[in-house]
Structure formats: structure tokens, C-alpha cells
């Protein structure tokens, strides 16, 4: 499809034939006749002087042919501009200033983690601050800068953490983030050439010092296909070629005993636990939720004992939140502690801060420990726990 119209009908310009009269929109014609500069520049082979310029030229030298004079002026101006540009370029090259074709990469003043737009988006959508915390970028930025939110709830958690009752990454308490899943995997300091780089969600594992015979080198010795075609598990282990898409990962080689389990989580061992949680616990739909429990449980820290299990069974039926994070679970199968939004509590008085002596039982996915926490984080009408 050519231009909207070529010329004013009747005035031929070279090989382009004028459109039939019925196709010429009156608006376009009007613009042409009025001499709209932009339209003229696009349509006419020669540019037409504006009336103001014509008047000026006429006032200067009435005897000369106005149009020729104007064209001469235009040509002179163009030549001058070209000369100036050429001079500037010469100067630049003589001073040996490198002119790069691409815009220079901006200096990152903030930490890489927060300045990256992908991470910002991840913050905005997946890390829901919940009750009364405005989830603006400004807040996230200020919190990233080392300021911790103040308030009764965070004070309480800080206290728990300092007493080693809450062995939990402080980062995930002060900054609302669902574990390391949102952080962009860092590029290795000395990346291998692209053919041998292992692509995986866990590119950070490439940061570890290469041991001889491990990783991609070992694969190359075995004559495997180029590793950009290899699928990898979260830890960087290669999925064998014939495996269907949904296959379970193989049992981990536990060379270092429990250390591997701990390094996978960002937090240390829980008090009183000697082994990683049972798979049933990980499979629980309500593993990361808080529940309303009777006053008897207030302030107690249960191990995964009969008492804890009993209270747990009792409270499953009246759970505050079933599992609103299923889609996140699917996207990020690693066990993490999801942010708990405040859930509305039935029958809580709106006027006073009383919660009817209720506390929250917190179950952590990664541990059999259950903690009963008094309700400090939420505003009056709500009950729940925020991380």
C-alpha cells in the first residue's frame, strides 16, 4: 500500500500517478493547499516556502525571483549545517573520543537486586506486604536500603529472632519477599563461553569454584550434547535426556549429611529438630498458614509432638486461610514460607484492639515446629501473620 495520496490531482510528479478524484480526502487536500509543513515534506518532491518566509524574502529583494532566492538560501543553510557537523565529527575523532553506537550502560546507584526491573515487578506482585503496608516501590526501596519497618509486630518478631526462637531469615521478615526465588540469579564472575554455560534457574550455582571433573567439564568428557540443550534441576543437576517433562528429581546425593539440607534453606536448624521435615508435612496444603487456636496455646512453642499435632488437627477445620498460593506453589516448587495475608476474623470487635484472646498457630513448611504467636501484626478487624 502506497502513501495515503500522492499529489494534488492533475499535478504529476514523475512516475507516481495521481489518485482518482473520489479518493482524495478533502482534509488532506486542504492541508496541502494551506501548506502544512509536515504534510508537504512527506508528499511533495519540492518543498514549498511558507508564506512568512516568502514575505521576508520579498521585503529584502523585491526585484529578484522570490522562489529561486528562497531555494538558494535553503541550500546554503544545508551546506553550512553539513560543514559544521563534519567539523564536529573531525574534532571528536582527533581528540580520540570513542563514539559508541549504543547508549552507555547507566551506572547503578542502588544495589543490583533492587534496581533490576524484573525484581521490582516480582516485588510488586508476588511479595504481598498485606495489612496496612503500602506496597509502593518507594517503600520497598527504602526498606531495601536497610531501614526496617517499625511497629509492634516487627518488634515482636525481632525479639523472637534475637532469642533464637525464630530461626528465620531476617531478610524475609523485614523485607516482604518469598525467599530467594524472586532475586535474579547472579551471573558468574568469570562466565564460560556460551556453549558450555549451564542454563538453569539456579545459575548462581555456577559461582561456586569449579572442582575438576565436575559440572560442565565432566559432561563434556562424557560426550554429552551441548549443555544449552540440557534441562537442569533447581540445584543445577542435569536432567537425563529421556526424562519426560514432569518427572520427579532423583534422590539427592547427601555427601555432607545434613549440611546440604540447610544450605538449601536460607535459615539454620530449628530448635529441637534433628532432621528435615517429613514429605507429608511438605505436601500439606495448609503448611504455611496461620490458624486460630484456643487461649491455652498462647505463647507456647510446640515441637511436632502429640500435643501440637492434636491442636493442628483441631484447627484444620476452622483454618483462617486454606491455600491462596497454589499458583505460586506451582511456579516455585521449592518449599518457602509464603507471605501470609491478614484474614478477616469473625466476631472481632471493630472498636477495640481486643482479639478475644486469640493467638495464631504458625506452621512452617520446612519444619515440624509449630509456634503460637499472639496477634500483634494486624489491625483491629483482622487476624493473621505477616512475613
Swiss-Prot record:
Organism: Homo sapiens
Name the record gives this protein: Putative protein FAM157C
Family: Belongs to the FAM157 family.
Region (Disordered): 1-21, 182-226, 329-353
